[in-house]
Amino acid sequence: MRYRLLLLAICLVLGIDSLSSVSIGAPSKQYVSPGTPVTYSDSGSTHVMALQNLATLTGVYGARHDKGAGSQPGQWMWACSFTLSGTNIVGAQIEIYVSWSDGTYADGALGTSNGSLTTADKRRDLKLVGTVVVDQTTSNTTMTASGMAWIPTRYFSPAVWNGTTLSLQNVANTSSCAFTPIPPEQQ
C-alpha cells in the first residue's frame, strides 16, 4: 500500500496522469541457445547405443551421459532417425525413453554402458519422451521425429523400444539419436 501511495505522489509531482504509463521494468525476450548435441549410434558418436539390427519388440539403451557438475540445462531436444528392414507397416511405433540418474540410482536400474532392455516391463520406470511413427510402406526408408524432453538430473541414458513388426536395418549407423541441450537465454 505504501508503495502505491509513493508512486501516486511521484506521478502527481511529475504530472503523469496515469499509472499505466509508468514502466517498472523494460520488456525482454526469452530465446533459446541450443548447445552441442550428444549423439548415440552404433559407433563414431558421443556414446554407443547398439541400434543395428534391433529386433522387433526388443529394446536397447545408450551409455550414460554426464552433463557435468554445476548448473546445467534441464530442457533438451531429441531427434531420432530409424531405418527398418522390409515393407513398413504404417502406424507402427518406435518408442524413445530417457532414464534419469543421480550417479548412484538410475531409472529402470539401467547400467552405465550400452545395454539391452531385458523385458518390455523394463520401460515402466523410464520416461517416455516420444515416438517415431512409421509413416510409409516403402522399405529401407529413414524415418525421423523429434521432440522435447525434460532432463533435470546430472546423468541420463536414452532408451529405444522397437514396437514395429520389423527389425531395424542391419547396417551400422543407419539408425541414431541426438539429444541437444536447449537452455533459455534472456535478452
Residue ranges and their predicted role:
Residues 55-91:
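Contiguous beta-strand segments within globular domains
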Residues 22-44, 155, 160-187:
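C-terminal interaction-tip segments
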Residues 74-83, 93-101, 150-175:
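Internal, hydrophobic beta-strand segments that form the core of beta-sheet-rich folds
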Residues 27-67:
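Terminal (often C-terminal
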Residues 95-142:
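Terminal beta-strand-rich extracellular "head" domains
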